[in-house]
Amino acid sequence: MIKPNRLANKNFLSSLDITTDEVFHILDLSKKFKNKKLNINLHNKVLGLIFDKSSTRTRVSFQVAMSRLGGTTIDLNPTTSQIERGEPIKDTARVLSRYCDVIAIRTFNHADLEEYARWSTKPVINALTDLEHPCQALADFLTIYEEFLDFKDVVLTFIGDGNNVANSLILCGALLGVEVRIACPKGYEPNSMVINKAYEIYKNRNLLKITNDPDTAVLGANVLYTDVWSSMGEENQKAEKDKVFNGFTIDNDLVSKADKEAIILHCLPAYRSKEITDEVFESKKNRIFDQAENRMHVQQALLSCLLY
């Protein structure tokens, strides 16, 4: 049995909090968990969840992952705790880190996540912020690795809003040396600091391309990835974004320009006829539900690394 203790007691706030070797270590552990070749016991360990945003896959995958590891999950609903009444983050963090062994947080402001980590004495995990979604990126690259058995020569194209998911794909892609292309409307590009940091990591700067032309971005791509155009908290921008993102739908025409063996990814929920057509979503190229399942296996690996 492998003892996955390389990340013990570290925070995981960003894809940049782990090294290339550590990414591969997590992916390797994830595959072992998926194939039932690894047994880790986190009995008496407690995971605390603080979710300011709604969630299906992230919440459930963390809960199931911790349960399968023998641990317990406490769901701390902000609306039924003192968080809702404005208790300072530093006070909440110092108390919860005496009750819990690890805390996963989904919040709007990345700075709030960093504040929790600053005051917590236990590991803090980014379960999504406005800046990054690093757990999602790990599951994404696990899915890609399962499909192609290697990252060499893989081209990943993300079509849509340069949001938290795109930011984490860029950073994790840089760590793995994967060519990442982002196609988004002008003004909706990924975070500039994320782009600059990725360029520092890439040995070949040409492996990261940001464009406003989806047709160019998908040429020869092995993976086509998209996400909702309007993230949580942007409901008032939906009508405007639907107009701006017209032409950035993954449809059969766009897919035909990619590699003939290309696969389709989406972090869900998906809005058919918006970012992706129903025909493409339901095609044989769909690896979206493998991708969703892999969230659970990655979470098992990550929790094991932090706690075992």
UniProtKB/Swiss-Prot annotation:
<feature type="binding site">
    <location>
        <begin position="267"/>
        <end position="268"/>
    </location>
    <ligand>
        <name>carbamoyl phosphate</name>
    </ligand>
</feature>
<protein>
    <recommendedName>
        <fullName>Ornithine carbamoyltransferase</fullName>
        <ecNumber>2.1.3.3</ecNumber>
    </recommendedName>
</protein>
<dbReference type="Pfam" id="PF00185">
    <property type="entry name" value="OTCace"/>
</dbReference>
<dbReference type="InterPro" id="IPR024904">
    <property type="entry name" value="OTCase_ArgI"/>
</dbReference>
<dbReference type="GO" id="GO:0006526">
    <property type="term" value="P:L-arginine biosynthetic process"/>
</dbReference>
<dbReference type="GO" id="GO:0004585">
    <property type="term" value="F:ornithine carbamoyltransferase activity"/>
</dbReference>
<dbReference type="GO" id="GO:0019240">
    <property type="term" value="P:citrulline biosynthetic process"/>
</dbReference>
<keyword id="KW-0963">Cytoplasm</keyword>
<feature type="binding site">
    <location>
        <begin position="55"/>
        <end position="58"/>
    </location>
    <ligand>
        <name>carbamoyl phosphate</name>
    </ligand>
</feature>
<feature type="binding site">
    <location>
        <begin position="231"/>
        <end position="232"/>
    </location>
    <ligand>
        <name>L-ornithine</name>
    </ligand>
</feature>
<dbReference type="GO" id="GO:0016597">
    <property type="term" value="F:amino acid binding"/>
</dbReference>
<dbReference type="Pfam" id="PF02729">
    <property type="entry name" value="OTCace_N"/>
</dbReference>
<dbReference type="InterPro" id="IPR006132">
    <property type="entry name" value="Asp/Orn_carbamoyltranf_P-bd"/>
</dbReference>
<comment type="function">
    <text>Reversibly catalyzes the transfer of the carbamoyl group from carbamoyl phosphate (CP) to the N(epsilon) atom of ornithine (ORN) to produce L-citrulline.</text>
</comment>
<dbReference type="InterPro" id="IPR036901">
    <property type="entry name" value="Asp/Orn_carbamoylTrfase_sf"/>
</dbReference>
<feature type="binding site">
    <location>
        <position position="82"/>
    </location>
    <ligand>
        <name>carbamoyl phosphate</name>
    </ligand>
</feature>
<keyword id="KW-0028">Amino-acid biosynthesis</keyword>
<dbReference type="InterPro" id="IPR002292">
    <property type="entry name" value="Orn/put_carbamltrans"/>
</dbReference>
<comment type="similarity">
    <text>Belongs to the aspartate/ornithine carbamoyltransferase superfamily. OTCase family.</text>
</comment>
<feature type="binding site">
    <location>
        <begin position="133"/>
        <end position="136"/>
    </location>
    <ligand>
        <name>carbamoyl phosphate</name>
    </ligand>
</feature>
<feature type="binding site">
    <location>
        <position position="295"/>
    </location>
    <ligand>
        <name>carbamoyl phosphate</name>
    </ligand>
</feature>
<feature type="binding site">
    <location>
        <position position="106"/>
    </location>
    <ligand>
        <name>carbamoyl phosphate</name>
    </ligand>
</feature>
<dbReference type="InterPro" id="IPR006131">
    <property type="entry name" value="Asp_carbamoyltransf_Asp/Orn-bd"/>
</dbReference>
<comment type="pathway">
    <text>Amino-acid biosynthesis; L-arginine biosynthesis; L-arginine from L-ornithine and carbamoyl phosphate: step 1/3.</text>
</comment>
<keyword id="KW-0055">Arginine biosynthesis</keyword>
<feature type="binding site">
    <location>
        <position position="164"/>
    </location>
    <ligand>
        <name>L-ornithine</name>
    </ligand>
</feature>
<dbReference type="GO" id="GO:0042450">
    <property type="term" value="P:arginine biosynthetic process via ornithine"/>
</dbReference>
<dbReference type="GO" id="GO:0005737">
    <property type="term" value="C:cytoplasm"/>
</dbReference>
<keyword id="KW-0808">Transferase</keyword>
<feature type="binding site">
    <location>
        <position position="227"/>
    </location>
    <ligand>
        <name>L-ornithine</name>
    </ligand>
</feature>
<dbReference type="InterPro" id="IPR006130">
    <property type="entry name" value="Asp/Orn_carbamoylTrfase"/>
</dbReference>
